[in-house]
Structures are given as structure tokens and as C-alpha cells.
UniProtKB/Swiss-Prot annotation:
CDD domains: MTHFR. It comes from the Eukaryota. It is an enzyme of class 1 (oxidoreductase). Disruption phenotype: Leads to partial auxotrophy for methionine. The active site is at E20. Keywords: FAD, Flavoprotein, NADP, Oxidoreductase. This is Methylenetetrahydrofolate reductase 2. Major methylenetetrahydrofolate reductase required to generate the methyl groups necessary for methionine synthetase to convert homocysteine to methionine. Performs 15 to 20 percent of the total methylenetetrahydrofolate reductase activity of the cells.
Amino acid sequence: MKIVDLIDKIPNGNAFYSFEYFPPKTTVGLENLSSRITRMSRNMMPLFSSVTWGTAGSTAEVSIYLAKMLEQHHKIPACLHLTCTNVDKAIIDKALETAKEYGIRNILALRGDPPLNSDHWEGKVSEFEHAVDLVRYIREKYGDYFCIGVAAYPEGHVDSNVPELSKDPLRDIPFLIEKVEAGADFIITQIFYEPEAFIKFENFVRNHSSNALRNIPIIPAIMPIQSYGSLKRMTRLCGCSVPSSLMQRLNAAKPDDEAIKNIGVEHIVDMIKKIMDNVQGRVHGFHFCTLNLERSVALILKNSGLLTKRWKQVESEMEDEKLLRTTRKRLSLDEPAELHNQVVVPSQQPVADKSSNLFVTSKQSSVSGHKDNLTEEAPFSVSEGSGVLGRQANWDDFTNGRFGDPRSPAYGEIDGYGPTLHFPPSEALKLWGYPVDESDITSLFQKHIMSDISAIPWIDEPVEVETKTIAKYLLKLNGNSWWTVGSQPAVNGAPSADPVFGWGPKGGRVFQKAFVECFVNGKDLKDFITKWHDNPQVTYYAGNNKSEFLTNAPKDGASAVTWGVYPGREIIQSTIIAEVSFKAWLSESFQVWGEWANLYSKNTPSRKLLENCINDRWLVTVIHHDFMDKNGLWKVLEIDF
């Protein structure tokens, strides 16, 4: 069903919301996302759900699969995102034809990232330079079959091709009008954390002299705060601002990740209420960028009153009394408060073994086999995280980017951007210049460790304070042409409130095994393997761009390299390294090499150098399992002082 038709059916005084998911990076993550979508769809009843589209159509197959699953299995109207620049027209055509075949009626037409330079697109001329081109194309080819959404930017949009222009939402209005006049039916905004920015934008749009935007549905996008780091990263990538009062609260809460999540929930709830009170009934729906996680979304819906409003609408539409009672029970609307008490059970997760299988509910669940089975009858309190079932459903709520649990639907850098440089070409060239030999690359890695530059292609922010504690070792390792893109020191029981190593709830202790991840040449890798392959204290994973893979880890093995022990809680493993996660990142890491190379024209010294690195280098992760030996890893790597 079309989104605009669904919105038209919302009675006055009621509210709606929708969910956004992104394609997981691993097969088991996709399986667990299916379970999570089932639970969220049944418990929270979104009006529709959308699926993001990877850079240059990189996730096309999985994105379409998820949209089909929403539409046909979960009976939730699906909206498929499509980006048009830097994408072959054949991919767009196939996606649209397949969407129509599966009964998907809604498309969010976006521009996407432009090519880095004229060589990047292999000389092809794209028919789609802007989102409006895609809107026109869909309308011309499919008439009114698809309901088309477009993006708007309450705080303004900065074009990476024209970085000297400052953000100005008013300057963007003519482009928004052009998209609507080309055939767009609804608008979803960029995320924001300043409610006043949206209120001001919405009021201006509604009263624009053209009258073109007076009645079109505008849905504000909401992204819960999952961690301090992810908030900083997302706001930088999206260009949205954060209220100083919110940043003060978050800074005071570091490193308590649970407190940061709760502060985020409170802020979003207040933001929703403020918007609802100041838009004269013109906006009564919100689009939640879930990041494939559910707990914060559930809490926001409950605490803001959106869930209750949505329930009233669904209740009025239900004629089957038995179905009504079942749904009410599942939403816990008739349940006493005692049923929400949290239950703690002993953990079955051994964390100190060299390379144990990953456990969630049983010892038979490995990295490749674990599935989240909390689906059909799980009540809303489970999505909130209450009780033992809630803990099982939200087992991955403390995410850790690409070093997180590969079974999690949220595994990876949860920003939806994929393996890109995250910088406009002009800014990237200022950061990294024009390297012509390997010593230039070594220098860039060392400058990043010393904070002389703010980013390298694989790490788009300054080094953490934790990394600085091992800077002298990393500088020497990079000096040996082992270029590091990830690392951590050994930690034995630091307080969870420690300003450098702490994370998670208060009153706990955190532990870390030392590891390092770097790009090395083939000869150095061979020498390392010859010496350390059979050492029980060392696990390594190595792969290159030719699909060659080497490891001394057991099949389906995984190493928990960061874990926390907290009062009244099961042990939480926030950082896990396994073959499945290494291979997912391996592919992306070499794509980043390619993105960097594409900054430079063909046959230039810099382009040739980086292409040689793609062909000759191996990505290697080395773990030292004795977390009580702070220097163990560096002895293995022969980095002595």
C-alpha cells in the first residue's frame, strides 16, 4: 500500500511512526534481523518500514530481499531507498522491476554520493545526477504505481562538490520544490537533534510563497543515541548540530554507555513532544532510523506516548475480540508492573578461553549458527529489555562497530554509509596529499597516531585516548611498514568508570586482550606465520584482495577481546573477533583502498602506488590472549623499548 494512502487514513489526534533498517553485513546478522523485525513489527506496529541502499548499489540484492520480507512475510508496507549517482542505470531498472514484482509500492529517491573524480565512473555518463532525475525517471516509466519520497534538510545540506558553501536550509527549498513538482509524494527529513531547527523549517516550508509544499506529508527522521562515539560520528557525517545542553549531559555521563543511551531516550522524547506541540497538527508521524536495534526505539515510543496513540488507532480497527485481547496482552497494557522486573540468570559465556564459540542461549550456538528465536509471542516488555527474555532479545545493545558481535544485525559501522572515505575529495586531498612511495603512506599513519592529522582513509576521526597509551608501540610498528587500522592494549579489571578504558554501566570491571590490525606485505606475513602459527597465546587472521585467507583459529571459533563484568548482570562481550567478522571487514578495507586510489587520476604516481598496495598488501589481525601481560603482544611483534 502507498505511504500517502496510509497517512491519509490516520484519524485526527492519532500518530504514526515508521522504522528504517539497513542490510546487515553477515548472514547470521541477517537471520537475526529477521527475528528482530518480526518482534518490532508485532509489538510496535509501524505504519511502514524502509530499507537503506548501499553506496553505488552495493547492497542492492540484500536491500530488495529485506523489502520483500517486510512486504510479504511481515505484511508491513515497505519503502525501498534508491540512490542514483554513481550507480549503473541497469541496477536501478532491475531494482524497480523487482520491487514492482514483489508488490513494493514505495521508493525513497535519494541522490547518493557523487563520483570522486571523472575517472571513477569508468567514463560512463549517468542519466541521474540529482535525486530529481530519479524522481522524473520513475514517474515517466511507471506512472503513479510507485509512491515516491524525497529527502529534505532542516539544517541545510552541504554539497561535497561545493564544500565552500555554508549550510542554508532556505537555499535548498527550490530544489525540494523541484523534486515535488517532478512527482514526489512525501518527504522524509535528514536526522536532527535540535527540535527548533525542524519546527522553523517546517513552518517556512508550509508558508512558502509557491504553495507547492503546503500539504505534502513531511516526516521528521529520528535517530536514537546508541553511544557517544556514534553520535559524534553521525552528526559530523550528516552535518547536523547537537544542543549544547545535551552535549554537556552526555560528556558528564561518559563512559557509562547505558546512561548515554538513557539520556538519548529522554532527549528524543522531549524533542518529539516539542515538535508535536508546535506544528499545529501538520506533523503527526516520525521515521525512526533504528540502526537495527530495538530497545531505545521501544522506550522512546512508550515514553513519548506515540505507542499509546498508535495502539488506539489499531484498536479501533480491530473487530476480532480474540485478536484484540491477544494484542493487548502482548503489549503488556493489561499486565501488572511486577511482570516487568528484571530477572538475572547465570551467564554461560566463557570469555577467557583462547577461542571459544559465541554463546547467547545455548552451547550449541556458534558464530555461523546462532539465531534469535524470540519472535512470535514476545511481549513489548521484551523489546524494552525487561526480564531474561528482554536480555536475550537485546543481547547486542552495546555495539562496537566492526569489532562487535558479527551475529548482531547492527554489526559494523552503524551509519549506513558503507565503505567510503566519508570526506569530500578536496578535504581528503588536504588530509593525505599525494603519496608517491610507501614511506609517504607510513608517514600518514604515524601522523594520525601523533594527532598531526585528524583521519586516515579507514579511520575518519582522531585517535582515541586509549590508543595514545600504546602510541609508542604503534609508531614503531608503522615505522616497520605495518600500517595499523585498529588496536587496543591489554587491560585487567579496570573500573567501568575509568576515563580511558571504562565503558558500560557503573560499578563494573572491564577486561581487554591486546590486539592489532594492520596492512603488511606478503614477506613479513610469511615470516610472522612461520614463527607464531602454533603459539597457543596468539591468534591471527590474514586476508588479501585476491580472496586468499590464512588463520590459526579453529573453524567457527571466535575471540572475545573486550568484556565487562557488572553487578546484577550477565557478562557483556562488546568486542569479538571472528573469521566471519574479519572477512566482512576484509572486503570493505580493500574497497577503502580503492576509494582512496580513485581520488587521483589514472596513471598518476599516487594512483599507481595505491593500486600496488591493493594488489600486494594483506590485512592482518593479531590477538594476544594473555590479558594480564601488558607487553605480550609487543613482544610477539618484536616491538621492544
